[in-house]
Every structure is written in C-alpha cells, then in structure tokens.
C-alpha cells in the first residue's frame, strides 16, 4: 500500500508510523493464526436465506477480503467501538467460533494494527478512486483519520 501511495506521488506518514508499529509488535502479530477475513462486512454485503427453516448467510462483494488475522473481521462491526465494547459482535462470534475472542492485550494490539491497516487502505484508495470534488474522497479522509487515531491510541 505504501508503494501504491508512492506511485500516486503521495507519501503516507501515518502509514509509515503503522509499519513501525508492526515492526515493534511483530512477536504478537506472528502468533495470530490466519483465516479468510472480510473488511467489508455490513448489511448490504450480507445475503440471508432460509433452508429447511434454518437461516444461511453468504457474504458478497469480497474485494476487501484477504487471508489474515481473524481479529480484522471486528474492525467494521460496530466500528466506532473499541474491541472490548463490541458486546453483540463478540457474543455472536464466540457462540460459533472454534477459538473465541477473549479481548486479551495481544488481541487488542492485533485489533489496533488492523484498524490502522484499514486506515491506510482508505487513505491510499482515495488517490485512485476519487478526486477532492467527490464525497468518497472526503469520507476516506475523515474515516482513515479516525481509524489511524484509534489504532495509534491502542499501540502506545
């Protein structure tokens, strides 16, 4: 993403700061098991149907899916809350998860890194998808600033 930013002839000081945080917490991050995660879980991207009286769910629009730390799924769920306050999301996830989220110090660090990662995605994405005259540009400006601030607050 930092290379994408450079190709747009821009520089991301907050992205570089995030990379330094990743280096600082690499021992914590290396312990995370990987699985398919989705940074774009919100109601328009979820399809539900009933089969034999049971609700089945499907995700659509997976352009922000990747193989990585499962804690990233929580970034967009109840997104303005810190991990420990995402009671509904944690309860639903933990009810079906093989490995529940316990909101440990390490999980909070991993969550903060993922918030910063989404901030970096939004920061860089605006250079390729929008101009300053588009609503999306300004949404990404403010949203990425919020994600970075929250991330760096959790990575002190």
Q: Language-model features: where?
A:
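Active-site activation/catalytic loop segments of kinase-like enzymes and analogous catalytic loops
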Residues: 71-102, 115-133, 143-145
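Conserved active-site beta-strand element of glycosyltransferases/polysaccharide synthases
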Residues: 67
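Hydrophobic residue at the +6 position relative to the catalytic HRD Asp in the kinase catalytic loop
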Residues: 44-48
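An alpha-helical support segment within catalytic cores of ATP-dependent transferases
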Residues: 1-39, 49-51
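Pre-DFG segment of protein kinase catalytic domains
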Residues: 36, 58-61
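ATP/Mg2+ or Mg2+-diphosphate-binding catalytic cores
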Residues: 6-7, 13, 122-156
């Amino acid at each position: 993403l930092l290379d994408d930013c450079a190709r747009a002839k821009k520089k991301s000081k907050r992205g570089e700061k995030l990379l330094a945080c990743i280096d600082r917490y690499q021992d914590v991050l290396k312990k995370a098991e990987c699985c398919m995660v989705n940074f774009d879980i919100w109601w328009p991207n979820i399809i539900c149907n009933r089969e034999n009286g049971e609700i089945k769910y499907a995700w659509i629009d997976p352009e922000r899916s990747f193989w990585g730390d499962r804690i990233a799924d929580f970034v967009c769920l109840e997104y303005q809350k810190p991990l420990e306050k995402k009671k509904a999301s944690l309860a639903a996830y933990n009810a079906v998860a093989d490995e529940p989220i316990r909101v440990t110090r390490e999980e909070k660090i991993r969550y903060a890194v993922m918030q910063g990662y989404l901030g970096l995605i939004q920061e860089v994405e605006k250079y390729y998808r929008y101009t300053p005259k588009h609503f999306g540009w300004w949404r990404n400006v403010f949203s990425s600033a919020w994600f970075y601030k929250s991330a760096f607050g959790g990575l002190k």
